Amino acid sequence: NKKLIKKKYFENMNDDNNLFLTNWFNGFVYDSDKFWFEVDDFDESAGDIKGVWELSRWYWVVRIAADSSLTHNKKLLLLHDKTSEWMRQNPYLLGPNWKCGQEVSLRVIHFIFSLRLLGLGPAHLDGSQVEFIKIHLDRILPTLSYARGQKNNHWISEIAALFIGGVWLRNHHISRKKPYIEIAVKQLRLALKKLFNDDGSFAQSSFNYLRHALTLISIIKLESEVEGVDIK
């Protein structure tokens, strides 16, 4: 399914009408005028919601940033254009792509990681990029307790997004008002105790979820070292 979705996406790279609102499993197009909590989880006509979430996880921005066939300026232009197009189709808190905190987290992590691959850092953020990161973190915060209650990979994903995003925003006079980093570090310490057993195994009996959690923790550590943020 992922191969099919990727193929369909890149074939429609320049066809932006409802690109990020389309369920690529069945072609269903979601409305973007409903708050995320009004989107029906069990609408049979919509099908599996992961079909619309897939593109909005933004793994493809990393692919753009790493594409050796594109110039640096072309990559920046593509990233800017696709970010603007995504926001046009997905106004803040409206539509299916704001529904899940983990999906929101993966999107902003991939966005920031793509900037890293392009040789950019927090000091290079423009106003639209700052706002893009901020609204994602602000969506995660109110439902973080829900992710914590699940005691699974969702919790780690949202912690990682808050930490990494908070690090990138800290010199833009935003995270002083909302202590994203402090919240993330506190939650990370708790999650490490709750989600990992003494033998190193994970709370979920899945190597994939264990790998996912360890990857995110590694990214948190790397980001803390690069930007000089103490997480001990």
Language model features: what each stretch is:
Residues 16-28, 33, 44-45:
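Terminal targeting/low-complexity segments that flank the catalytic cores of oxidoreductases
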Residues 1-19, 23:
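Extreme N-terminal leader/anchor segments
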